[in-house]
């Protein structure tokens, strides 16, 4: 999938059909009810479940209240512009609770952990691990064989469209609770220490830490051994 630029994302959101899907459990004299053709029904006897758009389901429930004894509605979004990514055929490990929007690219053998939030237009390279509760903003790009530590935020940019998103090159390790501001590029093989706030580009093969992040040293063997990427965790 080719990465979308900001204007393409804005157009996608503007022109998408906004959705308020609902799931309704209902019981009553359901055999007397004619269900709308654009509502999916799973009815057995006097009880069942229906799925549909609230704009269709709401008047349906009102019109048939004489034959509906009771119902419960489940709803988790309102006028949503972007569906979630269809993950069934993604060649990666994606754990429960990750929220990944459509138009996201995920490479082979990547790992997306619980609670991660991946916004539209983001790119995650082959073998990269996105740890728990990480946020990748719109169009944020992470290269191959990286580790983005738990709770970190890589700023993405959709608005204003002139701003640039974060780019993380290959073989980068980002510690926990790091914030990388928009427009920053982290060079190949760099290490960002936990808790850092990265406000400017990071040179390849360097170690940075602090608020704001500053270069501490060039990557040495000791640091490399402590930040090793384990391929065993990426096997499917």
Swiss-Prot record:
Its EC number is 2.3.1.89. Pathway: Amino-acid biosynthesis; L-lysine biosynthesis via DAP pathway; LL-2,6-diaminopimelate from (S)-tetrahydrodipicolinate (acetylase route): step 1/3. This is 2,3,4,5-tetrahydropyridine-2,6-dicarboxylate N-acetyltransferase. The keyword Transferase applies. PANTHER family: 2,3,4,5-TETRAHYDROPYRIDINE-2,6-DICARBOXYLATE N-ACETYLTRANSFERASE, ACETYLTRANSFERASE. It comes from the Bacteria. Keywords: Acyltransferase, Amino-acid biosynthesis, Diaminopimelate biosynthesis, Lysine biosynthesis, Repeat, Transferase. One of its GO terms (biological process) is lysine biosynthetic process via diaminopimelate. The keyword Lipid metabolism does not apply. The lineage of its organism: Bacteria, Bacillati, Bacillota, Bacilli, Bacillales. Catalyzes the transfer of an acetyl group from acetyl-CoA to tetrahydrodipicolinate. HAMAP family: DapH (MF_01691). It catalyses: (S)-2,3,4,5-tetrahydrodipicolinate + acetyl-CoA + H2O = L-2-acetamido-6-oxoheptanedioate + CoA. Coiled coil: none annotated. GO terms for molecular function: tetrahydrodipicolinate N-acetyltransferase activity. Gene3D superfamilies: Hexapeptide repeat proteins, Malonyl-CoA ACP transacylase, ACP-binding. Signal peptide: none annotated. Belongs to the transferase hexapeptide repeat family. DapH subfamily. It holds the Pfam family Hexapep.
